[in-house]
Design a protein with these regions (language model features):
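An extracytoplasmic/periplasmic, membrane-proximal ligand-sensing/linker region
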Residues: 149, 156-157, 166-183, 193-196, ...
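Pocket-lining segment of extracytoplasmic ligand-binding domains
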Residues: 62-64, 70-73, 100, 136-236
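Short beta-strand-centered segments that line the small-molecule binding cleft or hinge
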Residues: 66-70, 79-88
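Extracytoplasmic
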Residues: 30, 42, 52, 78-79, ...
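Divalent cation-coordinating acidic motifs and surrounding scaffolds
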Residues: 32, 38-58
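Bilobed "Venus flytrap"/periplasmic-binding protein-like clamshell domains
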Residues: 2-28, 33, 37, 90-156, ...
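Sec-exported extracytoplasmic/periplasmic mature domains
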Residues: 22-31, 51-55, 70, 131-135, ...
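Ligand-binding clefts/hinges and TM-proximal coupling segments of bilobed small-molecule sensing domains
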Residues: 115-128, 200-267
Length: 299
């Protein structure tokens, strides 16, 4: 039997994190069922694979798992996802060419904006953010492209801005090396409005020099991404994955900087109990709960 860990497109945020987790997981279980990383252009489609029993673990944005559990749009029926652990808290943000007149999000009106693959979690994040700011999708031209394709389109001036996932990621790094770009900021009060009206968002800082073109700190929308499984997943398998994560909170950021917020997220587990990890009301899997109790993160 082979275990499968579902992620996004190759080279993306989720894919790069899963590669490190799966390596540690397999290393900790010599002789156990091997786990492999799979990739899908649209991670929300992984929920269907969970429902069909074709995935054992997966990475998703925390806001979508509650919808999957409840069968709310874009999902057509309840899907029994269970939480394993958070993966990162990272910024989602718009990027424009440095010679563009686009300075803040309001300047995107009337422009061509790449939002990620159609139907993807990133595209739906963009919808939520524009709606919270009262910006209609009719006021600009949405373009649905993968992140690598969008980067090329920005360089070729086929689009005016693109929507970017948490960094570091390969597509953003390569874009910043190929072209002069900048982060699109929020006008006064816009970021506070988004964070106050959408409970699964938070403010997060893109650090200066995070990539070429990030010339100053930039406050952006942050989202927690999480590792999930299905309620039918065997307790010992989920226990093993959760134990690997909780035992490597210092090592994981050295393997991939996307994990740098992980230890702080685990501090919430110790302070507030399982609810700190149960985003969208999705329960912690019993195997994960047992691992965290054994390692002292839960009573």
């Amino acid at each position: 039997m082979v275990l499968r860990f579902g992620t996004s497109e190759a080279g993306g945020t989720f894919h790069s994190q899963a590669l490190e987790l799966v390596h540690l997981f397999n290393e900790a279980r010599p002789g156990g069922e091997p786990c492999i990383v799979t990739n899908n252009l649209i991670t929300l489609e992984d929920v269907t694979l969970f429902d069909r029993g074709e995935l054992d673990f997966g990475l998703m944005a925390s806001n979508w798992i509650g919808r999957a559990k409840d069968g709310a749009p874009p999902f057509t029926h309840p899907i029994a996802l269970r939480m394993v652990a958070p993966a990162n808290a990272g910024p989602v943000f718009f990027v424009a060419r440095s010679d563009s007149a686009i300075r803040n999000v309001s300047d995107l009106v009337g422009k061509r904006i790449a939002l990620g693959p159609k139907g993807s979690g990133m595209a739906q994040h963009a919808e939520v953010i524009f709606k919270s700011l009262g910006i209609s999708f009719d006021s600009f031209t949405p373009v649905y492209l993968g992140f690598t394709e969008a980067a090329t389109a920005l360089i070729d001036r086929e689009i005016d801005a693109l929507w970017q996932r948490p960094i570091p990621n390969q597509a953003m790094t390569e874009l910043s090396e190929r072209a002069d770009v900048r982060v699109v900021s929020y006008a006064a009060g816009q970021l506070a409005k988004i964070v106050s009206s959408v409970p699964f968002y938070r403010e997060i800082i893109i650090e200066k020099d995070a990539f070429r073109g990030a010339t100053a700190e930039a406050a952006q929308v942050g989202v927690v991404n999480v590792i999930v499984t299905h309620e039918r997943a065997a307790q010992d398998i989920v226990h093993a994955m959760a134990a690997v994560i909780a035992s490597n909170l210092d090592a994981l950021p050295r393997l991939n900087p996307l994990f740098k917020s992980l230890k702080a997220l685990f501090a919430g587990l110790r302070a507030h109990g399982p609810a700190a990890f149960e985003f969208g009301g999705v329960p912690l899997h019993p195997g994960a709960r047992r691992a965290y109790q054994e390692l002292g993160w839960l009573e």
